[in-house]
C-alpha cells in the first residue's frame, strides 16, 4: 500500500469504514499509530479500543472481520477512510451498518444477489438452474431477452421496455458470473474509454466494412 502521512500527534484519529462495493458507511472507530500499522500489516482493520485501552481487531470475537481494500486520508491528514470487504454484519446488533442506513439498489447489489444465489443450495433458484445448465443455456436466454428489448423499443412501450431491460441486465450478470467477469472490470474498461482522447468514430472502420 502507499505510504501515508497521518497526524497521530494527538494520539488517536477517527477511522471510518466504508463497504468497498456498496459504498455504505459501516462504522466509526479510532486508531493510533500502532493500530494503523497493524491494519496495514495484517490487511484487516484494527482499532484502538478506548474502553479496553488496547488494540482491538474488528471481529476478533465474532469473526466479522473487515478486509482492507483501500485507504484514504483527508486533506488535514487527521481522518482516515477505509474501503473494506466486510465478513458479515459490522454492527454488534447484527446490522450491516452501525448507522442503520439503507443502501439503494444498484448493479453491485444485483451482482451480489447473483453470486449469493450461485453459492446457495436452493434447488428452486432460477439463477442456480441457469448456471448449472451452462454457458449455452445462459447465452440463449440472454439473446432472447436482448431481442425483447429491441422489440419493445421499436413498439415504443416505455413500461414494457424498462421491464425487458431489467430482465436483460439480470441475465447479463448471470452470464458475467458464469464467465468469471466482475463488474469492476466493466467499470475499468468504461473508465479507460472515458479518459481516452480522440475516441471518436473517425478512428473506426465504417460500418459496412465490419
Curated annotation (Swiss-Prot):
Top-level taxonomic group: Bacteria
SUPFAM superfamilies referenced in this protein's UniProt entry, alphabetically: all-alpha NTP pyrophosphatases, HisI-like
Region (Phosphoribosyl-ATP pyrophosphohydrolase): 107-210
Record's keyword annotation contains Signal: no
Region (Phosphoribosyl-AMP cyclohydrolase): 1-106
GO cellular component, one term: cytoplasm
Pathway: Amino-acid biosynthesis; L-histidine biosynthesis; L-histidine from 5-phospho-alpha-D-ribose 1-diphosphate: step 2/9; Amino-acid biosynthesis; L-histidine biosynthesis; L-histidine from 5-phospho-alpha-D-ribose 1-diphosphate: step 3/9
Keyword annotations from UniProtKB, A to Z: Amino-acid biosynthesis, ATP-binding, Cytoplasm, Histidine biosynthesis, Hydrolase, Multifunctional enzyme, Nucleotide-binding
Gene3D superfamilies tied to this protein: MazG-like, Phosphoribosyl-AMP cyclohydrolase
Cytoplasm recorded as keyword: yes
EC number: 3.5.4.19, 3.6.1.31
GO biological process: L-histidine biosynthetic process
Residue spans crossing the bilayer: none
Annotated GO MF terms: ATP binding; phosphoribosyl-AMP cyclohydrolase activity; phosphoribosyl-ATP diphosphatase activity
Subcellular location(s) per record: Cytoplasm
Reaction catalysis annotation: 1-(5-phospho-beta-D-ribosyl)-ATP + H2O = 1-(5-phospho-beta-D-ribosyl)-5'-AMP + diphosphate + H(+); 1-(5-phospho-beta-D-ribosyl)-5'-AMP + H2O = 1-(5-phospho-beta-D-ribosyl)-5-[(5-phospho-beta-D-ribosylamino)methylideneamino]imidazole-4-carboxamide
Family affiliation: In the N-terminal section; belongs to the PRA-CH family. In the C-terminal section; belongs to the PRA-PH family.
Protein name: Histidine biosynthesis bifunctional protein HisIE
